[in-house]
Each structure stands twice: as C-alpha cells, then as structure tokens.
C-alpha cells in the first residue's frame, strides 16, 4: 500500500511535468503504462483483501481520480496535438449485480495488449465521488457494464470484435 502511494505520487508529478509540453512529451511518456501497472496492483489488493476492504476502496477512489486526470490529459492532447488516439472509459460493478462485468474486463485487457496505444480507464460505477458522478451524469452512465468509447455511450457487454468495429 505504501509503494502504491509512492507510485501514485510519482504519476501525479509526471503528469504535471508532461502537461507543460503535452505535444512534445505525449508519445515518450510512460504515464499510461504506469497507470496500468498501478491498476494491476490495485486488482491484486482487491483479490487479496476483498472488494469491500476500506483500504482497497480508498485506493480505488484515489486511482479513479488519477485515471480521470489522465483521460482529460489524453483528450486535451488528442485535440491540441492532432493525435489519433482511442480512449475507453469502462464502468463496472463488483456488487454482484453485473453478470458480464468480469468478462468485459477480460475483453478490455485483451484489447489493451493488442493495441497498447489505446487508453482504457476502469471505474467502479458504485463509487460515490463528485468527479465520477459528474462524468456519469454528463455521459448518462446508469448501468454496468457501460463503455464510453471516444465519448460515445455503449451500454451492455461488447465483444472485442464489436469494439474494434466501433473504433475503426
């Protein structure tokens, strides 16, 4: 947990440094990969300590804020630097009310490996946080799984093929 805090602080600092010259540093930044690694560590903590562990929930909320900030950065650089980049916001639930969420997670992991330049952000739909609630309202996210692919809302499970067709 302490290593996770250090990693997240490093990402915050790197974000500030990169945002000074977004077009110059966009392709060279390991920011995306580090965010992905922290997500993997968070998954490990969730599996070891449980979804409802207070430390896990707090870290998950903090990680969600890092993801939102990174997503905003990617959106900004995509527009300012004219970079063709796909981003997906994935809303899931761990509360037993989403039969296809785990499978959707596997599909997105597969796509991340196949297309490393694709940015995928995962959010627990049940986290009650002002920033996440703003995104959910703005994009009408009401159920899990929901994918926001380049700002378009897709409710329900999507296969890898269907997602690939959407981003072409």
Where are these regions (language model features)?
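Solvent-exposed loop/turn segments at secondary-structure junctions
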Residues: 94-97, 126-130, 153-155
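Solvent-exposed, acidic/flexible segments
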Residues: 35, 59, 97-101, 156, ...
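Short, intrinsically disordered low-complexity segments
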Residues: 130-142
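General small-molecule cofactor/ligand-binding pocket signal
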Residues: 121-124
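Solvent-exposed, polar/charged alpha-helical surfaces in well-ordered, non-transmembrane soluble domains
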Residues: 68, 106-110, 161, 165
């Amino acid at each position: 947990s302490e290593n996770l805090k250090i990693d997240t602080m490093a990402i915050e600092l790197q974000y500030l440094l990169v945002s000074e010259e977004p077009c110059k540093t966009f392709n060279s930044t390991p920011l995306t990969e580090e965010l992905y690694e922290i997500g993997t560590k968070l998954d490990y903590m969730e599996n070891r300590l449980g979804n409802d562990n207070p430390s896990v929930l707090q870290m998950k909320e903090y990680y969600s804020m890092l993801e939102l900030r990174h997503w905003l950065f990617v959106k900004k650089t995509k527009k300012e630097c004219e970079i063709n980049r796909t981003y997906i916001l994935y809303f899931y639930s761990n509360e037993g009310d989403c039969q296809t969420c785990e499978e959707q997670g596997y599909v997105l992991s597969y796509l991340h490996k196949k297309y490393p330049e694709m940015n995928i952000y995962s959010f627990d739909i049940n986290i009650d946080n002002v920033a996440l609630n703003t995104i959910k309202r703005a994009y009408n996210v009401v159920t899990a799984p929901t994918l926001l692919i380049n700002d378009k809302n897709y409710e329900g499970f999507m296969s890898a093929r269907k997602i690939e067709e959407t981003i072409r």
